Amino acid sequence: AHIITDECISCGACAAECPVEAIHEGTGKYEVDADTCIDCGACEAVCPTGAVKAE
């Protein structure tokens, strides 16, 4: 699964890109549902701050 670090600026690019809708808005940053995430890396590729990391 992927994780979203504190560099997240809540722009929503990752959530819009996720093909399985595993990313949702959390408190202060977006969060990845590890059970739904398919590790495709689409979110990591579009994050402007590099906040999305492979776990």
UniProtKB/Swiss-Prot annotation:
InterPro entries: 4Fe4S_Fe-S-bd, 4Fe4S_Fe_S_CS, 7Fe_ferredoxin, PSI_iron-sulfur_center. Keywords: 4Fe-4S, Electron transport, Iron, Iron-sulfur, Metal-binding, Repeat, Transport. Residues 2-27, 28-55 form the 4Fe-4S ferredoxin-type domain. Pfam families: Fer4_9 (PF13187). GO terms for cellular component: cytoplasm. Its cofactor is [4Fe-4S] cluster. Signal peptide: none annotated. [4Fe-4S] cluster 1 binds at C8, C11, C14, C47. PROSITE patterns: 4FE4S_FER_1 (PS00198), 4FE4S_FER_2 (PS51379). GO terms for molecular function: 4 iron, 4 sulfur cluster binding; electron transfer activity; metal ion binding. SUPFAM superfamilies: 4Fe-4S ferredoxins (SSF54862). Binds 2 [4Fe-4S] clusters. The keyword Isomerase does not apply. [4Fe-4S] cluster 2 binds at C18, C37, C40, C43. Ferredoxins are iron-sulfur proteins that transfer electrons in a wide variety of metabolic reactions. PANTHER family: PHOTOSYSTEM I IRON-SULFUR CENTER, PHOTOSYSTEM I IRON-SULFUR CENTER-RELATED. This is Ferredoxin.
